[in-house]
């Protein structure tokens, strides 16, 4: 992957949302260590806030993404090898499949530290982990395996809920496919899915409460206006009304 980065990509820092988030969490915007933003989940915001207070000057948002990328790659390889062994194939067959996945489909996500692609990499690893679960080992083992897969899916959700949705669809599709192909009993699949649903249900509820707070209304309205004016078509194509709502002007 490092060779891919050096020879096949243009290595540079780009002023994208990731840089803005790293700066805001790091106290580089107005000298305030932020604990909330409209993109990442509340729990991740609290974690970044605490780490920045304890060890300031570190780009913790980028560190968290690098950790998520490493864990996602490791989980994909390990899960592919376990799945191969369950199919009575040599472990190297799973390793080869995982390497093909990492270099073929996941290379861009693993070598671009952007929260959207990091979420995609974590979601892909979650599907690998789901397929590798031994669903015949009983309900407790099924729940543990599903939660292990759900943790990777949860990492994608914490980074960016919108980017996590495609991974969620693939995860649910893999769950249904396991049942239809009779690779796993439906009761075990249901127990695993229910455990993951509880985890996400609590997180969605916490996020909804935070977003509904009156003090967030003006900030969220400004972000919505800015997104409409700038992100969809650029400043040149933005209407004057949209620019005015975001506090900008055509000039």
Residue ranges and their predicted role:
Residues 34-59, 63-68:
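Short hydrophobic/aromatic helix or loop-helix immediately within or flanking a transmembrane segment
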Residues 161-177:
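Transmembrane-embedded, aromatic-rich helix segments that form part
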Residues 58, 95-121, 154, 158:
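Aromatic- and kink-enriched transmembrane "portal" helix at the membrane-lumen/periplasm boundary
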Residues 144-160, 172, 195-202:
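Membrane-interface alpha helices of multi-pass inner-membrane proteins
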